[in-house]
Amino acid sequence: MDDRGRRCCTHSGVIALDIEAKWQNAWDRDGIFVPKMDGRKKFMITVPWPYTNGSLHVGHGRTYTLGDIIARYKRSRNYNVLFPMGFHQSGTPILAFSERIRAGDRSTIDLYTSYLKEYGEKDIDALIESFKDPKNIADYFSNAIINDFKHLGYSIDWTRRFTSADEFYQKFVQWQFRRLNEKGLVKQGRYPILYSLEDDNAVGEDDIKDGDTDKVTIEEYTAIFFRGKSFDLIAASLRPETIYGITNIWVNPDVKYVKVKISGRMAVVSEECSTKLKFQGNEIEVAGEASVQEIQKQTYTTPAGKEVKVYQADFVDPDNGTGIVYSVPSHSVYDYVYYRKKRGKDFPVIIEAPMKMKDIESKYDLETEEGREEATKDLYRNEFYYGKLVDSGPYTGMTVREAREAVKRDLISSGNAFTFYETSRHAVTRSGSKVIVAVLPDQWFLDYSQPWLKDLGHTMINTMTMHPEVYRNVMNDAIDWLKERPCARRRGLGTRLPFDDRWVIESLSDSTIYPAVYTNSIPLRSLYETGKLDDDAITRIFMNGEPKNEDESEAKRQFEYWYPVDIRLTAIPHISNHLSFYVLNHAAIFPKEKWPAGLIISGLVVSNGAKISKSKGNVVSLLEIAKKYSADIYRLYVAVQADISSTMDWNETDLASITRRFNEFKDLMAGFKQDTSDLTFEEAWFVARFSVRLRQFMESMDRYQIRDAYINIFYGVLNDLRYLSSRGGDVNRALTPVIADWLRALMPVIPHHAEEYWHSYVSDTYVSVDPFDENFQDRYERTVRRFGMTCDQMYSAMDYVEKVLQDVKNIMQVTGIEPKSVEITVANADVVRAAQEFLNNSVSGQSKKYMQYLAKRRKDIMIYGFDEYDVLQRNQVYLSKQIGCPVRIERGDVINGKIALPGKPVIYIS
């Protein structure tokens, strides 16, 4: 252990605030979470560095709290733990918010004013003014988050912190991109991207409001021309194979439509679509409005030669596709609902599939939006996987999968259609700017489609620790799905692309292998400040080559010691982006021995059953948690409210329940007085039970089953103490031999109170870095040995007593007898020996007289490692008290035709 962990912490040197503030200051003052390289096994854990455009809330806190619990647990098992943290200051959100403040945008100013009030700032106007510089936003919230994390008791090594805006780190990112480029993974070309209209810039998941939990993807539509006499209509579809089932075209009477010149034609689309067409590289010219009445005056011819009319429908969304929809009632739920209202139920069926529209109508409530949405998904899925085309010209007989690509290809090649890109849902950036799909002719992107890279990614995923295991296949699927990914933008904060400095590397691409820099950020920064950090130096440090100076040597030593990351913990929404990029960039850059060793993927967080959002009024900030609820209660809530993979619901009902048990624990500790006198049988049982619980706790924690671990070691031990007290045991005497290990076990979740009680009752070292004695089991075995049992036997003995007691109560309930006395006869030595021989199929002559009984009752035989008579005799008073009459314990064999079996005594009530 580092000497820092053993240093005495006198109370006079600690700021006398409340328990949590006191120990936060003490830990920080003595730097106990700043590890040094030593001979112990190392453990490096990372969680995503926070984005610094605002305060964090209870949902964010779950990930960081789980990471800290694991880091603290590993320290308790004598690992040399590195739990570092930095800050993500790249991308467009910070810049966009700053620009909105400069422009005097009231909603943005109000938002940041609310943040500053929460942090208790006085000169808010001056701070808002300073936020016109985006760097000031990033730096302010970086510092605020440090304080939030300290208030929650996170055991982070802050000496290694850096940001994605730090110039030495940007040198590292440029080195990374040069290596990716050398491997043929960085490319430039025409590519569709998510784009912010107001910011005039590409955006990614990190830039989009709710982009991490409600994904926005790019969908490829087929925009089809329908020829008219004066002008054409363009309708975009994800299902071009349905073109042979068209009955009509829908337009929305409340939408503004415009005529555009495109591909040598005059065509009509919604005004919103005309903007999107421009950004997708189409040469168009808007030639004026087209009224709905004008559109409906003429008929239109499909590419298959069918003439159709235009009808009005208010479900048509002007901001989705072209704002014009061609109707296929047999194969579109919305078309079906609207068409039958206007024209009845006579329409062609051009896809044969197990599920028909009549099945959909009986299964779902098509009068509701929710019903139509669910029905649409079900129908599309069924037809895609099982459908075949009929009455569809040359495509008849094809599967839907085959026909979709064939029809699209033929329509485009004949000039009757073109590709149009649309977002999978309406989206805005974090600063409120509308997001569309744009096609840039010179976009830089990372090519994740390379087979060799995917093979390496799969190898990494299939050989690492994965919790929960179910996500291994999900991660492999995400790797398979990933193709080209835009990696740079024209504007925003971040690192300049090294081979084209007009572009800034986007915020998901500059934060893939950054955990490597945690290992040696201090010497790397020193190298940069002395002008010695170039690509060659970075290669020598992170790859091959002899270091050329002391800073390089130190940087390489630390990297070699700490890397790879042993556990990366993040939330499920990051699988398709952060985690996939993390895996593939490590695979591309580093040798296998430096690949991440493990991933833990946590579930989502809701508040009172609803998604966390300001509009719902259920946002609880990390600062508010520490002030209002206490850090340790929040940490305990995170640990026990849900297992890692499940959704955690932050709600007052569960919080109140957890708080009550926590207060019970505090009352227990406040009244504790050490007592080293001899233990009674019941108190020895508690020690034995604790020994078993502690072993189970460690097994659960080693599997990252945090909820199970703390239900056991926190609630379970409290319940055991209640039971002990009901048996007349002395809680103080029972706790004395286990209190140190109990506080060590509780420390990862309630570190402040564990530290307080540790210093009060155990030692002047820090429990946060005072590990378990790996031979703790021997110590507890010695404690209970004087009762002639092992810990497991002692634990089983009390369960046996309760089982016998329950058998007595069951007999009383069935017979209705109010007992005056109870006689319990346990198997004597002859029966026990006979039962052992019977179970081993080696019956001696002396034992044969019991065989007729044993053969009938084989399933009831339970041979314990303790003397049943002795155990029941020790608990005779307890049994008498519980039953309400005298209890006598005897040894015997056959009583009134019933045999006393091992584990199943004969009970006689009178």
UniProtKB/Swiss-Prot annotation:
It catalyses: tRNA(Leu) + L-leucine + ATP = L-leucyl-tRNA(Leu) + AMP + diphosphate. A motif ('KMSKS' region) lies at residues 611-615. GO terms for cellular component: cytoplasm. Keywords: Aminoacyl-tRNA synthetase, ATP-binding, Cytoplasm, Ligase, Nucleotide-binding, Protein biosynthesis. A motif ('HIGH' region) lies at residues 50-60. One of its GO terms (biological process) is leucyl-tRNA aminoacylation. It comes from the Archaea. The keyword Methyltransferase does not apply. NCBIfam families: leuS_arch, PRK12300.1. This is Leucine--tRNA ligase. It comes from Thermoplasma acidophilum (strain ATCC 25905 / DSM 1728 / JCM 9062 / NBRC 15155 / AMRC-C165). The lineage of its organism: Archaea, Methanobacteriati, Thermoplasmatota, Thermoplasmata, Thermoplasmatales.
